[in-house]
Amino acid sequence: MIEGLKVKALICVVEIIENGINSIHAMGILLFALNILKKASVLVSRILCAWNGKLSSEYPRDPRSRLGIFKNMNIAFICDGNRRYARKLGLEDSFIKDKGLQKIYEFIEFGCFYGIKEISFFCFALSNFKRSPEEVNKLMGLVKQKIERPKEIGIRPKFRVYGRLDLLEEDVRKRLMDIEEESKNNTSIIVNIFFAYSAEDEITRGIQFNSHVDILIRTSNTKRLSNFMIRQVAKGTSVFFAKALWPELTTAHLFLILLKHRLENKYLLG
């Protein structure tokens, strides 16, 4: 029954409330509407649990399905689980990390489609330098070879890079800085890349990232922040721990996570 439920049914619920909640005066009707929203939120939660790791990358692409429900949101990801996914499938880490990188572009496209204002990815922690030199070198090689320039993506994101770039090899640092420079006038969506980064280090060196974040999503069901977005969470950023590993997370997962957040925060808590 849960698997047969269409995402569009939930969108219809949101659309009804979006169009009518401001004009509802009868308290009984209002409570009824809020009860529907609460049940819809619970259904979204159940779908996320039932379909964890199994959702396709399909989501409503019809412009009429957008409704502006995610417009101007600021979302962030802790991209965790690449190595576990590689072990799970018996594949090379480098292949999986490439897949994980493509997942970033997939979510940037999703964000552009739904009018998300800002999207952040925690890709490489400062503490990751403690990993084996071989693993670190493979990741740096992936950055040099696979990160696409803004003009090659097909959309026009504005990239911002945060972290200790001074600790990176010169060619890796130049690659990241070039992407930031080339996209500085783009306006479709702001994409923040956190590389060689930790929140504690940022505070020590002076605050750089000050944007309010609506929701922080961490994959792999690891319930910790890993020194990321600490100030934002302390100031009210919602946190969602997804069971799916980073390469398993799909745009359908993301759609439902954001819809759940929207239902709860705009109508049930706000």
Curated annotation (Swiss-Prot):
Membrane topology designation: Peripheral membrane protein
Entry keyword set: Endoplasmic reticulum, Membrane, Transferase
Protein name (record): Dehydrodolichyl diphosphate synthase
Subcellular localization: Endoplasmic reticulum membrane
Gene3D superfamilies found in the cross-reference section: Decaprenyl diphosphate synthase-like
Function: Cis-prenyl transferase that adds multiple copies of isopentenyl pyrophosphate (IPP) to farnesyl pyrophosphate (FPP) to produce dehydrodolichyl diphosphate (Dedol-PP).
PANTHER family: DEHYDRODOLICHYL DIPHOSPHATE SYNTHASE COMPLEX SUBUNIT DHDDS, DEHYDRODOLICHYL DIPHOSPHATE SYNTHASE FAMILY MEMBER
InterPro entries linked to this entry: UPP_synth-like, UPP_synth-like_sf
The enzyme's E.C. designation: 2.5.1.-
Keyword Transcription regulation among UniProt keywords: no
GO molecular function: ditrans,polycis-polyprenyl diphosphate synthase [(2E,6E)-farnesyl diphosphate specific] activity
Similarity comment text for this entry: Belongs to the UPP synthase family.
Pathway annotation from the record: Protein modification; protein glycosylation
The keyword Metal-binding is annotated on this UniProt entry: no
Gene Ontology annotations of biological process type: dolichol biosynthetic process; protein glycosylation
Database matches in CDD domains: Cis_IPPS
Enzyme type, top EC level: transferase
Gene Ontology CC annotations of this record: endoplasmic reticulum membrane
